[in-house]
Structure formats: C-alpha cells, structure tokens
Amino acid sequence: VYLTMTDWNNAEIYAKKVMNKYPLTSNNNYLAGFSDINTPSWIWGMEQSEEQNMGDYSPYAMWYIGTEDGGYGYWSFKCFFLAQSFVDKFEANDVRASQFRWEWDMVHYTLKFRDNEAGRGSIVFMRTESMLLNAAEALCRQGKNDEAKTMLWQLQDMRGATRSVSTGKELLEEIWLERRKELYGEGYGLF
C-alpha cells in the first residue's frame, strides 16, 4: 500500500520487515512449479481443496500447462501463452528461462505453474520476491541507488541474471523489468 501511496520510506521499512520473516524462493522451489501452499517464500496463498474446486481444477488450467517431457497437463485450456518479446527479456543462464517451452513452432508456454497430483495446485498471491522488489523500488525512488542495487542483486544473483549497474530512472526501469520477469502470472499484471 505504501508503494502505491508514494510513501517511499514506509514502503522500504515494511517491505524489509516482511522480508525478514520469509526466505526468497530457492531456485529448486521455483523450478518445481508453483503449486504448493507450504512453499517457505509464499507470504499469502490459497490452497485448492476438493470442496472449493469441483471440476474446473486450479486456475492454472487457463495457462497452457505442458509437462517437462512434452506431454499435456491436467485440464489445460490453452488460453495464456508467453509473447516472444517477453521470453527475449531473459538471459540464457537465467534459471527462470529454463521453464519456457516452445510448442507448435510458434508459441511459448511455461512450466512455472503446475497442478499438484490431485489436479488442484495452490494459488500464490504474494511472495517474498514482491517485497524485495518493493523495497528496491522504494530505495531507488529515495535516491538510495547503491542500496537499491544491492537489494536487486540478491534476486539477480540467485536467478543467474546479470547485475544491474544503472542508477536513477534507468535503475527504476530495471527494477520494474525484474518485477515482470520474476512475478509474471502471479496476478500483478497480465498485459
């Protein structure tokens, strides 16, 4: 809320408080697919029970969910694909890029979201990475470029992305790009 209110100081303070309580998503957890409510970095999520979800299975069915071996996932309606321009934002050694799959020689899908064995993957609403990126943006907007970069580097280093060397407006743009790359499909924006 403080970020939206442009209260940069409080946005920084409270994002850091939350970050102190939850770890970042390990690469192993990231690559396992987002379906487990018990993932340590999930601050807020919703488990899909049989009573809540009687037949449509998880909302991840709206994504084209393939399997690692090229098969089709549970109840995939094949509605959401990744644009080539978005996929191109990821460097080859970025662990997040390893989840992209090319289908029909024309579209990308992702293994980021997967159903669990019961076909009802939990839904993530907020992760520690969101707080990290909020803190980095708040720091940048306060002119604390070195602190903002140090915050951003935690995520970039973990994922295998190149560290940002920018300052000012360019650093802010890189923080926003990293937000898009890290949090895509998690409800922060679909376009």
Each model region followed by its residue ranges:
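Acidic/polar-rich alpha-helix caps and helix-coil junctions
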Residues: V1-Y72, Q84-F191
